[in-house]
Amino acid sequence: LSPLGLRWRIDLIYQMAKQIKERFGIQVPSKKDDLLSLPGISEYIASAVCCFAWNIAEPLIDTNTVRITGRLFGLEVKDSSRRNSRFRNLITALIDRDSPRDYNYALLDLAHLICLKKQPPLCQGCPVRTFCCFSMLS
């Protein structure tokens, strides 16, 4: 990382590892609040760790999940939509509580393979096209 000019990331990772060892033994915490208390951990990273490491139902709010949600429900998506409570509430309500890890992986795959950002989405191959507002209007 240092040759890439990312020395600050090395320092963050070091500080984070040190705090994890001091505060939690050697176990990465499973509680979102504990993760957020660590240096360099954002809301998204904390949610991703809870979901992918611990299979806890945490929403992943990013441009991809917001784009899919906007298209599904026919909502206008703006740069600020990631911070919009309406999108957060919808994304949270849709999480599969029994298999949140699989659900979030599927959502990210959908965003990268079918519900594309810069190209027209591939609605014909979309598993949710029958109830997607965007697909019905295209």
Stretch-by-stretch model annotation:
Residues 1-137:
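Catalytic cores of DNA base-excision repair glycosylases
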